[in-house]
């Protein structure tokens, strides 16, 4: 499981919004169990307070409920707990870099870097009062982050060229930790999907062409069903 921590100054506007936007994306795509997402503040000024009402209103307008979320302050121990620690501006970055001993494992990231805006900051709407602007920028960053997370862990199986069962087996062997296995059952495939070689991976299956034989289509459907049951299929 990949663990992600969003950071802003007070943990009542930007970072909780990013937390819940990304959670929503992961839930809608069936990936929520593959990631743990949270948020925190670099300051202690808002500890215990809920999401700032204008940002909470924007979340609700998009069907996202952030009830129960309260601000907390980031701690040095969080560096070991999370795989990615994503900040909103350079002030956040400087504080985190100092707290985490200059980021020896390279975990610190700027959110808008994921949107192709290297070094760009998301201004604190508590001061600017530009809540919609902050929302738009956070959403853009989260969309880029989501694509990066999914692409990093995604394996594509292309059955569109398969004309017989041997082609299907060859595609599985070439793209997965797949042994020379043939048979009518798919128990081996289940073991591979849920075992260590592909732990944390997601899969995209490109189906056979319409011109493929019925036996190929039928077997490809059975393979797809195993991926769905294992909870690792994106599309």
Predicted regions and their residues:
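A generic local structural motif
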Residues: 69-75, 96-97, 190-192
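Phosphate-binding/catalytic loops
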Residues: 84, 90-150
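Short beta-strand scaffold positions
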Residues: 87-88, 183
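Conserved beta-strand segments of alpha/beta enzyme cores
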Residues: 36, 65, 107-109, 153, ...
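Conserved active-site segments centered on acidic
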Residues: 1-81
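Positively charged, polar, low-complexity stretches
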Residues: 152-235
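Short, conserved loop/helix-junction motifs that constitute active-site signature segments
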Residues: 79-80, 101-104, 196, 227
